[in-house]
């Protein structure tokens, strides 16, 4: 099908236009890219210069740098790059201007002849990590998930939530160097683990490897050290979102996490989707977050009617294990919003950097079929999942996990959020 002939209702139509980075196998000079100063920058962590920014339309990707040069766009120098970081840093005005231009390019018939050479079938390209990750922070924002975890590990506690949970978004710093793009194999991690009945810890591969279905938020504009980012400034700093799988070794995590929290049980791999959906594509998906049950401190209080619209997002996530859907977590149930997480992350004066990534935390709904981790779905291994290819409590070598999602868009159409997939491999494979 020609690139412009996107079927009506396609979740990757002109209403969406997510950004990614791609290369064409066998091409070392970049797809349709000019030489010269506009090809500066680094691609991911590899320094590869054969990668370039693309925008998805249907089942094609548009080389937006080449298109911008051909059409004389003033933003060509931001787009003809091997990573999204220059565009991320350019700020909200540039983001809006580029999006308006892209929408016109792919919808106005007079542009077709110029742009058609710069479209490539998705089946013919390789997708890469779309931005250079600066810092990575992960949160714990789902009340359903937090209560489930509390009931599993603290069954005798008077309250399954910790005393601070309703007062602040709990989070921790992860490892940006182990953020990988969808399709990257995940090697089963090793570490210390100790079962309750064991006299001493042992070392070896994790036997309780899990996933966490999350949404990641990508920071564009940095902030000054010592200057907190207010709730109302969220959209001035955050460019868009992606799907995120926070792989977790539950046995390693359980032994190590007291008193400082997650470390080796989390730091070995975090997978993200290859497409970054700009916030401007998700206006129709904005919803009010769940009702607050505790009064919030002013820097987290989002009840002000003057705020820039509701802070929640109605994102419908699907979790598939070896091709079988096992859960459909609803992001609209998240207690803490991305804006509140950003405000809390910077309230002490910690600065933002272009390319910062922060995860929402595991997304879990109130129903059993809406839980976003195997820990919850199997209730810590007590209730195995019955799948066509056998039972599962935690992940086995060779298992493939795929998260996909969509959001409500204009006129009833869906906004596709792509997918993030990863295959578990044993060490030495």
Language model regions located:
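Active-site microenvironments in enzyme catalytic cores
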Residues: 1-25, 49, 56, 62, ...
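A structural micro-motif recognizing beta-strand termini
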Residues: 23, 346-348
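Intrinsically disordered, low-complexity terminal tails and inter-domain linkers enriched
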Residues: 25-51
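Short beta-strand-to-coil "C-cap" segments at the C-terminal boundary of structured domains/repeats
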Residues: 221, 422-429
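Short beta-strand/loop turn elements enriched in aromatics
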Residues: 311-333, 357-375
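Short, surface-exposed linear segments at secondary-structure transitions and domain or protein termini
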Residues: 335-346, 426-429
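Active-site pocket scaffolds in enzymes
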Residues: 339-343, 351-354, 358-406, 413-423
């Amino acid at each position: 099908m020609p690139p412009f002939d996107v079927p009506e209702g396609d979740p990757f139509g002109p209403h969406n236009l997510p950004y990614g980075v791609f290369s064409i196998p066998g091409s070392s000079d970049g797809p349709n890219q000019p030489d010269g100063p506009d090809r500066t920058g680094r691609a991911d962590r590899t320094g590869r210069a054969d990668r370039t920014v693309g925008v998805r339309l249907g089942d094609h990707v548009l080389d937006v740098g080449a298109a911008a040069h051909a059409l004389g766009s003033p933003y060509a120098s931001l787009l003809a790059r091997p990573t999204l970081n220059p565009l991320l840093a350019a700020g909200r005005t540039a983001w809006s201007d580029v999006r308006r231009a892209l929408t016109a390019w792919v919808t106005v018939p007079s542009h077709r002849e110029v742009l058609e050479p710069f479209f490539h079938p998705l089946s013919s390209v390789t997708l890469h990590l779309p931005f250079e990750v600066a810092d990575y922070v992960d949160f714990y924002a789902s009340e359903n998930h937090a209560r489930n975890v509390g009931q599993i590990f603290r069954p005798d506690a008077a309250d399954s939530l910790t005393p601070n949970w309703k007062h602040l978004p709990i989070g921790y710093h992860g490892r940006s160097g182990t953020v990988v793009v969808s399709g990257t194999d995940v090697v089963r991690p090793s570490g210390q683990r100790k079962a309750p009945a064991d006299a001493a810890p042992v070392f070896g591969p994790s036997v309780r490897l899990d996933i966490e279905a999350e949404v990641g938020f990508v920071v564009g504009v940095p902030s000054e050290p010592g200057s907190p980012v207010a709730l109302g400034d969220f959209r001035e700093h955050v460019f868009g979102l992606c799907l995120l799988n926070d792989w977790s070794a539950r046995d390693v995590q359980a032994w190590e996490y007291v008193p400082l929290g997650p470390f080796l049980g989390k730091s070995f791999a975090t997978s993200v989707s290859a497409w970054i959906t700009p916030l401007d594509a998700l206006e129709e998906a904005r919803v009010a977050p769940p009702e607050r049950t505790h009064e919030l401190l002013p820097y987290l209080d989002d009840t002000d009617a003057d705020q820039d619209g509701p802070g929640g997002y109605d994102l419908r996530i699907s979790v598939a294990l070896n091709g079988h859907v096992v859960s459909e977590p609803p992001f609209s149930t998240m207690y803490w919003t991305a804006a509140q997480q950003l405000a809390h992350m910077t309230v002490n004066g910690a600065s933002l950097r272009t390319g910062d990534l922060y995860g929402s935390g595991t997304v879990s709904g109130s129903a059993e079929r809406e839980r976003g981790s195997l820990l919850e779905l199997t209730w810590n291994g007590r209730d195995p999942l019955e799948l066509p290819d056998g039972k599962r409590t935690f992940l086995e070598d060779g298992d493939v996990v795929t998260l996909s999602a969509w959001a409500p868009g204009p006129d009833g159409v869906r906004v596709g959020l792509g997918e993030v997939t990863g295959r578990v491999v044993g060490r030495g494979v």
